């Protein structure tokens, strides 16, 4: 059985209007019982009575006004993930930086320009409410005359028109994760046990996902070979999770209290079932479809594929890229990947597979791509979607997120496709400032620092948002902030610091608010140079300050093992274009709750203006 509601493409065509519209939306937040995965209901956030919140669709440069009504029993905010907010920094939605929290029973109106165009999402930026369901997808259609990258896909005029129609009318695929615990309960288990907890009950796609319990033996059979490196001779739990007391995963920060971790959190698996979302497509109407995946999970990264359908990745983090044809794509929390798919298969149903990517749990969730014109195919020949465990011989990807053949092409989460249609980054000689981070655990297994060994909480300045302070460093200690001057190019070295107590770091998806940044280099070992100019002179092959640079707002570090390396780093480069109280943080919810963030105060030399 599939969902009875047909999920038609987003209904507003790009009419080619050159003037900006004024668009008004209302989001009412409520705290009610729900069960997106068919398991035990728990209290969660609904937006306008829905989970996830409604898709918000705008045209580039629309003037947007969103009234948020907070009927939750908690403070909250809304962050518009990926939007620049250059003209309206007060709308960025970070408590303590751009606003005071929206208190229970209160309202707040966000006003901003819908810019840049592309795939985005919105979510709470207050404590762990994103994990409780305060999320929704957002899409901004490009102007009709925007330069597009599709010539590498096809030169056929009809196909190019169909591709642009698909771009303007995508299916937004919001991937999240779910646990029967509220975010506050989840975090309290970390505090009481001392463990870094990252196990979930299920993945969800557009708010739906079943719980499968195929047994740990099967889960280990389909898991990535790299998982062996962290299991320390143990087995996965029935839930597909790592044992909670693995020394190389938790670091040397004991003692821990295993009794404070309920068995349902990590060990027990209780199956449940909901109908998968169905994406209906009609190749006779339009021969291409765009699926725009949003990494909205609190704890998990994902890999996705569509059975029998190669995909052209054409947009990452809202930015057009040089298209690449693949069968599997890895996505970390905060990132967005749009793929263009040609509808040229036998009419039928095909599984859209979404699996955990990251080596910390083995599980999958499914949606279905359904051709509407199946009637003329003999019933026995109509393809049926193979979903659930033990369907690994079908499609490109197995239940554990691994490929089913060496011929399967995969875009890894560490690969960054070159940006399309934008100038390359400037040479390193034009950079005015080089800033450094130092990612490391502090004091225990669940507290993470982005730099200076500090644990940052945006709420610590909730009553005095830094945007409205003439001297922000008089309100927040300098160790909690990185500062820049206006109209300058800045490099930030995102570096993992090796520590003998802190053996393994998972990949960290570091998200930057405000404008995007170029990824200009990465490497293993310590970043031992004063700046990129010095590093380029010694190891030029590690840098790409040219047209191959990616332009993103989420930057994912590679898997780190201090037993094999003494550091790892990524360098990003961006232009400071105005006063902006930005933030740089890991988008894994438990890491951010554990302190992994720094204020990024741009343009402090013009702050009092």
Curated annotation (Swiss-Prot):
Biological role: Required for the conversion of the yellow polyketide pigment synthesized by wA to the conidial green pigment.
| Any one of the GO BP annotations | pigment metabolic process involved in developmental pigmentation
| Required cofactor names | Cu cation
The principal location of this protein is: secreted
Domain Plastocyanin-like, first and last residues per copy: 45-141, 270-372, 463-602
Could you say which residues bind Cu cation 2 here? 81, 123, 587
Q: Recall the GO molecular function terms of this protein's record.
A: copper ion binding; hydroquinone:oxygen oxidoreductase activity; oxidoreductase activity
- Ligand binding (Cu cation 4): 508, 586, 591
What is the originating organism of this protein?
Emericella nidulans (strain FGSC A4 / ATCC 38163 / CBS 112.46 / NRRL 194 / M139)
Cell location? Secreted
Which residues are sugar-modified?
Answer: 75, 257, 403, 443, 486, 531, 546
Binding residues for Cu cation 3: 125, 513, 585
Please give the superkingdom of this protein's source. Eukaryota
Q: State how the cofactor is bound.
A: Binds 4 Cu cations per monomer.
Q: Which InterPro entries match?
A: Cu-oxidase-like_N, Cu-oxidase_2nd, Cu-oxidase_C, Cu-oxidase_fam, Cu_oxidase_Cu_BS, Cupredoxin
Q: Which gene encodes it?
A: yA
Database matches in CDD domains: CuRO_1_Abr2_like (cd13850), CuRO_2_Abr2_like (cd13876), CuRO_3_Abr2_like (cd13898)
Q: Which reaction does it catalyse?
A: 4 hydroquinone + O2 = 4 benzosemiquinone + 2 H2O
Q: What keyword terms does UniProt attach to this protein?
A: Conidiation, Copper, Glycoprotein, Metal-binding, Oxidoreductase, Repeat, Secreted, Signal, Sporulation
Q: What is its EC number?
A: 1.10.3.2
Protein name, UniProt field: Laccase-1
Per UniProt, Cu cation 1 binds at 79, 511
Family designation: Belongs to the multicopper oxidase family.
Signal peptide position in this chain? Answer: 1-20
